């Protein structure tokens, strides 16, 4: 139910804003995973059907270099809500592939990034929206998804598996 996707976090937020914020974010992140390659979806859900997915801020805060079968990712992402309780997280970055810039996200397991203990905000302290640092990490192609939908030949790999994203 699409309306429930909005209603439930709103109701929870009446009692606890931080919890409502995390519920809303986590729901949208699980939906985003549906457009990724089937291999990473199965890697996540087969291992743990209750896996939580956070997101490094959707604005690209990292950079990547194209290499054979993937990328090398480096960056500092701030305001990663729910990162401390999540098993996985998305990270946005700009890929410069021989002068062609392409906005991407990748998904990484918590063992692949460093969480910085820098979230010291009074109002939404319990969201655990710490920063994340990644330095020269190889990310295989199947964990990447381009979100530059206006370019020729763009596809969402996961649509072969998930016909209805809602």
Map each language-model feature to its residues.
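Glycine-rich flavin
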Residues: 1-86
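Generic structural signal for alpha-helix starts
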Residues: 16, 37, 109, 139-141
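Short solvent-exposed loop/turn micro-motifs enriched in small/polar/acidic residues
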Residues: 55-58, 99, 125
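Short Gly/Thr-rich strand-loop-strand
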Residues: 61-63, 117-123, 131
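DPxDG-like acidic metal-binding loop motif
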Residues: 76-113, 117-118, 128
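Glycine-rich beta->alpha junctions and the first turn(s) of the following alpha-helix
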Residues: 122-123, 129-166
């Amino acid at each position: 139910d699409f309306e429930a996707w909005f209603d439930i976090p709103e109701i929870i937020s009446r009692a606890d804003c931080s919890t409502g914020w995390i519920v809303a974010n986590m729901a949208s992140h699980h939906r985003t995973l549906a457009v990724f390659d089937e291999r990473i979806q199965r890697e996540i859900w087969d291992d743990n059907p209750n896996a939580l997915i956070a997101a490094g801020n959707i604005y690209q805060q990292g950079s990547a270099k194209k290499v054979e079968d993937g990328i090398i990712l480096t960056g500092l992402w701030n305001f990663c809500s729910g990162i401390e309780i999540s098993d996985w997280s998305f990270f946005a970055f700009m890929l410069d592939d021989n002068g062609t810039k392409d906005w991407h996200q990748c998904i990484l397991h918590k063992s692949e990034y460093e969480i910085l203990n820098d979230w010291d905000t009074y109002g939404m302290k319990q969201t655990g929206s710490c920063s994340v640092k990644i330095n020269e990490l190889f990310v295989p192609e199947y964990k990447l998804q381009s979100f530059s939908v206006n370019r020729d030949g763009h596809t969402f790999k996961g649509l072969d598996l998930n016909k209805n994203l809602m």
